[in-house]
């Protein structure tokens, strides 16, 4: 029996460092940032969900289910993850941010391999130096634990997953895979990299 793996693209943040622009909709090389992300992960998963707290109609134009946080008040990535975990029947949920256009094309395979090798509940990606807390594969059954953590006033994803059996999948061979866009300057640099990839 093959596993079902769905994905959620997190596009629910305030993007303060981008002057408040909705990062997923910022154009990069003629496409919305989220389109680059969709292209990278679509072959790796069954269903894609988009977590967005504004411009929902615009996000719906990409052809996927759009979910807004069940917990109101822009509470960060955990709120979007909790919402998505409540809307999937999959065995695993892939979590990625909307502003990482160079995500690995073998992201799911390597995260899943790390889970199996370590008998873990979730796997987090690493660029070889640092863990990437918003790039992970996890069991949706962890929703209750994550909800309790958020409702206790906690926000840091790495503090949450440290409480669970987690594995790290290293992508040191793809050092730019998790480069994201927080400033207009980073956007310019990334545009040049995409042209070369």
Curated annotation (Swiss-Prot):
> So where does GTP get bound?
10-12, 23, 51, 69, 99
Q: Which cofactor does it need?
A: Mg(2+)
What keywords are assigned to this protein?
Cytoplasm, GTP-binding, Magnesium, Metal-binding, Molybdenum cofactor biosynthesis, Nucleotide-binding, Transferase
Disulfide cysteine pairs (residue numbers): none
Name the Pfam families on file: NTP_transf_3
Give the Enzyme Commission number: 2.7.7.77
GO CC aspect terms: cytoplasm
Top-level taxon of origin: Bacteria
GO MF entry, a single one: GTP binding
Q: Which GO terms describe its biological process?
A: bis(molybdopterin guanine dinucleotide)molybdenum biosynthetic process
Q: Which reaction does it catalyse?
A: Mo-molybdopterin + GTP + H(+) = Mo-molybdopterin guanine dinucleotide + diphosphate
* SUPFAM superfamilies on file: Nucleotide-diphospho-sugar transferases
Subunit organization: Monomer.
Q: What does this protein do?
A: Transfers a GMP moiety from GTP to Mo-molybdopterin (Mo-MPT) cofactor (Moco or molybdenum cofactor) to form Mo-molybdopterin guanine dinucleotide (Mo-MGD) cofactor.
Name of the protein described by the UniProt record: Molybdenum cofactor guanylyltransferase
What organism does the UniProt record list as the source? Shewanella sp. (strain MR-4)
